[in-house]
Amino acid sequence: RFALLLLSALSSVHARQAVSAQPHAACRLRGGAKDERTYAMMKPDVCSNRKAEADIKRLIEEAGLTIVREERCRLSKAECEEFYAEHSERPFFPGLVAFMSSGDVIKLELQGENAVRRWRELIGPTDSEKARKEASSSIRALYGTDNQRNAAHGSDSPESAARELALMFD
């Protein structure tokens, strides 16, 4: 009888682990909030500064977001072109690709309540000068220098997050 009870308990634990290990898009929490995942990336201008990296990770955790996956790497020009393909016709595209492939980046999968919106708020406006005026404690205000060397990337929607996570981690 004890063996059956133990087997039943173990089966239940393994079933919960299998379910929780599976990736998910967004789950509803109390009050209608969404537990979701988003893609975040620290750009080469930040990855050359270990203190800035540590500060940004601390800010992520203080914002109630969890780093689910993290990978430091150097993106190839081809990977940058694919990632930023939606901007391929824009005049800044060649410079963006050159910058993003110039040094290490840190790819992050973040999870938490309304993660896409919260990460975007944490990084602030795209242009670092604008961020310093409008969101002085944002990551881009603190660590960015301009519109391109702006410290961090953040998915702009749950759909973009799903696409970017698949592209950068799968």
Regions from the PLM with identified roles:
Residues 18-19, 23-170:
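Non-catalytic terminal and connector segments of soluble metabolic enzymes
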Residues 1-21:
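N-terminal chloroplast transit peptides
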